[in-house]
Amino acid sequence: YPGICRNLSSAERDERIAVGTPHALRLKMDKAIAATGPLIWHDAEAGPQHARPAIFGDVVLARKETPSSYHLAVTVDDYLQGVTLVTRGQDLFEASHVHRLLQALLGYNSPAYNHHKLLTDSQGNRLAKRDKAQTLQSLRAVGYTPAEVRALAGW
């Protein structure tokens, strides 16, 4: 995000919103980091991690059509549910830097994390529903054993 609307006045923001201009609520990353200072989170595989949320720039917290971003939603949801161990795929490892920052800003304790390997096909593409990849059920249907499925995950 190049910061085009970062320093609009309240009046300018209100005017743009009133006429239906698409808009987003962003976290001013530099101010957020200054407010929390250095942060650490712990991953079961990778060990202690120094949070580097600045790699994302001013992250979106909400949009006109989406009342809450993934980052904000999972941070609040995990807290409200009392989650103490967050288990997600390795593809979401970097997002944890932002989540740790949001936890600190909201006064939440940081849960432990475990970012697991992803199941991939023979070409190394992850098995994802959105890509219409094979499902575990389809792998079982063609005869994959539990041990073979674990081998796909690198275990």
Show the residue positions of the predicted features:
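Extended, charge-rich low-complexity interaction segments
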Residues: A141-W155
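Active-site cores that bind ATP or allylic diphosphates and position pyrophosphate for catalysis
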Residues: Y1-A128, T135-R140
